[in-house]
């Protein structure tokens, strides 16, 4: 009979977190869920964040989807990323919710996107649909910080997208805007509206938005480190 797993305390440092993540490499979602006595959803359509929550549980993360990093005390964000058999990302990566009001004085240096991406523990997970969720395995972890070129690309896109928000043009932004960073609606249903600024500076109600990393940003990042 399997011994149930008790979630660890938050890691004391980066090395401890990385070693914990390495221990998960090669294990399947089914094995991890069984040890934690957690039910496995039939698929991820309604439980998009399930894989991330399962790995957070095993690594002692605490932030959930709050603005701070998952491991705020050691300055690290956890990002799971579904990949195909070649290690190529299968979808964009959610970074954080975009603030649609109260943005006076905000700069790249002080924004949530930069804080979240300053140090990331990437964990690739098998994500091809033909592999049943329970059989999908965890890949080797990677600790990453943006290099100068990556940071510049992110900053440029963030500033362009924030200009749309501040100037009341948030509803003009499409998925085509941004070279590596996208601004997209983030709501499970279209009735969940939030306040934003309209073209004439008036309050409007619109869908919540989130910042997402494009696959053309995460693919080379993974390829460089895993020599895909």
Curated annotation (Swiss-Prot):
Main location: cytoplasm
UniProt GO BP: DNA modification; mismatch repair
Taxonomy, superkingdom: Bacteria
Disulfide bridges in this chain: none
Subcellular location per the Swiss-Prot or TrEMBL entry: Cytoplasm
SUPFAM superfamilies referenced in this protein's UniProt entry, alphabetically: Restriction endonuclease-like (SSF52980)
InterPro entries: DNA_mismatch_repair_MutH (IPR004230), DNA_rep_MutH/RE_typeII_Sau3AI (IPR011337), DNA_rep_MutH/T2_RE_sf (IPR037057), Restrct_endonuc-II-like (IPR011335)
Gene3D superfamilies, sorted: DNA mismatch repair MutH/Restriction endonuclease, type II
This protein's record includes keyword Membrane: no
GO cellular component: cytoplasm
Keyword terms: Cytoplasm, DNA damage, DNA repair, Endonuclease, Hydrolase, Nuclease
GO MF terms, alphabetically ordered: DNA binding; endonuclease activity
KW Iron (keyword) present: no
Entry-linked HAMAP family: MutH
Function (record text): Sequence-specific endonuclease that cleaves unmethylated GATC sequences. It is involved in DNA mismatch repair.
Family: Belongs to the MutH family.
Stated name of the protein: DNA mismatch repair protein MutH
Taxonomic source organism: Photorhabdus laumondii subsp. laumondii (strain DSM 15139 / CIP 105565 / TT01)
Gene: mutH
